[in-house]
Amino acid sequence: MHTFSHDARNLTLDAKAGGCFCERLPDGGGVEHMRVVYASPGKLLRLSGAIGPLQEAALAGTMTWNLSQAGGGTTVELIYTVGGFRAGGFRDIPTVVDGVLRGQLTRLKALVETGRPDGGSR
């Protein structure tokens, strides 16, 4: 889990327009990772913000979660687009961010299918 507090239980998402994807920190502080800009329950969730270390640069990001019904289940499509200025450029960023997001999607799939984010038995 990639969080500043190293504990996913500190993450919250208020999935409505203007809602916060936020994290409580152990010292009483907090982090606003992203802000919800579009919410259509069961269909689409769009957030705006630069996640993780991208917050330190002059970047803007948009993350879109598209949900669609398929074969008795749900297909999840995640798109995260980032632009702006970053000292040193972007060469190393896409691979790292894609890897983190892919890992989170893998954990989400395991949670839905097994009830545990690590995919283990209950």
Question: For each of these PLM feature ranges, what is it?
Answer:
Residues M1-H33, G42-L44:
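Short beta-edge strand/loop motif at the mouth of beta-sheet-based domains
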Residues L13, G28-G30, Q55-L59, A70-G72:
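A generic structural micro-feature
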Residues E32-Y38, G61-Q69:
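Hydrophobic/aromatic beta-strand elements that line small-molecule binding cavities or substrate pockets
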Residues H33-R35, E56-A60, R86-R91:
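A short, polar/proline- and glycine-enriched secondary-structure boundary/capping micro-motif
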Residues S40-L45, G72:
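Short, conserved beta-turn/loop elements at beta-strand boundaries and strand-helix junctions
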Residues R46-A60:
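Short solvent-exposed strand/turn elements
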Residues A50-L54, I79-R86:
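Short, solvent-exposed aromatic-acidic interface loops
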Residues T75, V82-R122:
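A conserved amphipathic terminal alpha-helix motif
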